[in-house]
């Protein structure tokens, strides 16, 4: 089992797909990493040699932020926006959509389940 950036890659999958199990690596960046490391994307994870795994690990370490470091950087960016009090930071703090979406009807993912408000008695 190949272990890269603290993640065990699935043995049966192609390395091109297996790398996407690491947070911060998608299909495009996976192919870019494999090209730099000189590894065939169609190779199964179980068939990789230790040298190939080491090459892939080196390329990832020198060029990308992945897993915990990436999560930490994203959290710090959001925290910074909240501290400076900009519009995006306020939206993050209130748990509302940040990128200009309308909130009159939808936005349930960001707002959470509906909370029904009781009507006033006449």
Swiss-Prot record:
Record's subunit section: Part of the 30S ribosomal subunit. Forms a loose heterodimer with protein S19. Forms two bridges to the 50S subunit in the 70S ribosome.
Gene field: rpsM
GO molecular function: rRNA binding; structural constituent of ribosome; tRNA binding
Domain of life: Bacteria
Keyword Ribonucleoprotein: yes
Family under the similarity heading: Belongs to the universal ribosomal protein uS13 family.
Keyword rRNA-binding: yes
PROSITE patterns given in the database record: RIBOSOMAL_S13_1, RIBOSOMAL_S13_2
Region of interest (Disordered), ranges: 95-122
Name recorded for this polypeptide: Small ribosomal subunit protein uS13
Native source organism of the sequence: Lachnoclostridium phytofermentans (strain ATCC 700394 / DSM 18823 / ISDg)
Family annotation (SUPFAM superfamilies): S13-like H2TH domain (SSF46946)
One GO cellular component term noted in the UniProt record for this chain: small ribosomal subunit
């Amino acid at each position: 089992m190949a272990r890269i950036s603290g993640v065990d890659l699935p043995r049966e999958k192609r390395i091109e797909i297996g790398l996407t199990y690491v947070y911060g690596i998608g299909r495009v960046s996976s192919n870019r990493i494999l090209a730099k490391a000189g590894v065939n994307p169609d190779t199964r994870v179980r068939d990789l040699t230790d040298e190939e795994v080491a090459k892939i690990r080196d390329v990832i370490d020198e060029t990308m932020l992945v897993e915990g470091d990436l999560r930490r950087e994203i959290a710090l960016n959001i925290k910074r926006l909240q501290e400076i009090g900009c519009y995006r930071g306020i939206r993050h703090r209130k748990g509302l959509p940040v990128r200009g979406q309308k909130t009159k009807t939808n936005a349930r993912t960001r707002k959470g389940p509906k909370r029904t408000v009781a009507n006033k008695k006449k």
